[in-house]
Amino acid sequence: MLNKVQSRKRRHLRVRNKISGTPERPRLAVYRSEKNIYAQVIDDVNGTTLVSASTLDKDFSAKAGSNKEAAKLVGGIVAKKALDKGIKQVVFDRGGYIYHGRIKELAEAAREAGLEF
């Protein structure tokens, strides 16, 4: 029987077989830990990370009171960095997580900041 983490990893592998980031439309990958949330814009063809943001960054303000607020700030930061590099369209990779809570807040903040997906 699979536990929660193994099920998430299995879902993520299943999704990763279907989507990949290109230089024109890179992949916005999200990882969530107990305390922090991370977002990267990845070009899978070249195997490079173009932009990244997380709650551990120096430019991240520790003013976020809750995890959802922190995810919203990270989504805005990663979108702003991507737009500064000329990236407007991405493919959203939720990393096998359910589209709810912190993942949803990050995605909606990135959309509000101007990223298209």
Swiss-Prot record:
InterPro entries: Ribosomal_uL18_bac-type (IPR004389), Ribosomal_uL18_bac/euk (IPR005484). GO terms for biological process: translation. CDD domains: Ribosomal_L18_L5e. Transmembrane segments: none annotated. It holds the Pfam family Ribosomal_L18p. Disulfide bonds: none annotated. Part of the 50S ribosomal subunit; part of the 5S rRNA/L5/L18/L25 subcomplex. Contacts the 5S and 23S rRNAs. This is one of the proteins that bind and probably mediate the attachment of the 5S RNA into the large ribosomal subunit, where it forms part of the central protuberance. This is Large ribosomal subunit protein uL18. It comes from Clostridium acetobutylicum (strain ATCC 824 / DSM 792 / JCM 1419 / IAM 19013 / LMG 5710 / NBRC 13948 / NRRL B-527 / VKM B-1787 / 2291 / W). The lineage of its organism: Bacteria, Bacillati, Bacillota, Clostridia, Eubacteriales.
